[in-house]
């Protein structure tokens, strides 16, 4: 699969605009971190010892980290010398820089979602982060699979199966809280659904542009879709933080 060279300048321009928007959102979050006082406790337990809070996560600051990771990734991909390397890789149907960015934004986001839904055990949070990041990094392997059909989607399928596990943990905690009469707030519930839908959209886009959108523009279109999904992800995070704050 190849990329139309005429579309590469557009890709760099879109990345530059996206970087500016991510940066603006990140600055809003950092500026509001002082007054948006949502602290999410993290607990550490050992056998026979009650779980005790040993740290807390500032929601606004953590969300700012996610957004600024996207800002830095998109900015560096839009200027030389990395711009040319990214274009060269995309021309070969490979989007390693995108997977590096997504592995961090997706994993930190699902950890924040887990914290908002009451998952506070440090060991569980570390496992959630590792599973989410590892699932996305399998897409780096998927880029190197050229066989059409199901046999060429082994890495994608494994990544999707692994990536849904952290969200399953979140769902389990939501259901448990409903059963004990302590449901999460409407903002947290809506934010969880929105971020889950965007996570699913990222994976669907990978499958769609590989299996259904077979054209000379498929890789460039996939990159554009990823950028737009990333912007929607930032908007959803920003909305959740501001509404909870």
Model-identified regions with their sequence ranges:
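Conserved, mostly hydrophobic/aromatic
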Residues: 102
């Amino acid at each position: 699969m190849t990329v139309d060279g005429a579309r590469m300048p557009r890709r760099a321009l879109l990345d530059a605009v996206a970087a500016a928007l991510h940066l603006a959102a990140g600055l809003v979050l950092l500026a509001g971190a002082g007054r948006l006082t949502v602290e999410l406790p993290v607990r550490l337990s050992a056998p026979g010892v009650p779980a005790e809070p040993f740290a807390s996560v500032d929601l606004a600051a953590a969300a700012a980290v996610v957004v600024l990771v996207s800002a830095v990734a998109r900015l560096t991909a839009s200027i030389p010398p990395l711009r040319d390397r990214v274009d060269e890789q995309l021309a070969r149907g490979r989007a390693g820089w995108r997977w590096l960015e997504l592995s961090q934004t997706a994993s930190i986001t699902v950890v924040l979602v887990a914290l908002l839904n009451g998952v506070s055990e440090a060991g569980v949070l570390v496992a959630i982060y590792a599973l989410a990041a590892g699932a996305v990094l399998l897409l780096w392997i998927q880029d190197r699979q050229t066989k059409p059909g199901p046999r060429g989607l082994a890495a994608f399928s494994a990544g999707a199966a692994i990536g849904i596990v952290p969200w399953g943990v979140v769902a389990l905690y939501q259901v448990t809280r409903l059963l004990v009469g302590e449901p999460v707030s409407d903002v947290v519930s809506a934010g969880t659904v929105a971020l889950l839908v965007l996570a699913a959209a990222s994976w669907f886009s990978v499958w769609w542009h590989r299996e259904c959108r077979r054209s000379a523009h498929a890789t460039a279109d996939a990159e554009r879709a990823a950028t737009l999904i990333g912007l929607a992800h930032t908007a959803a995070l920003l909305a959740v933080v501001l509404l909870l704050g």
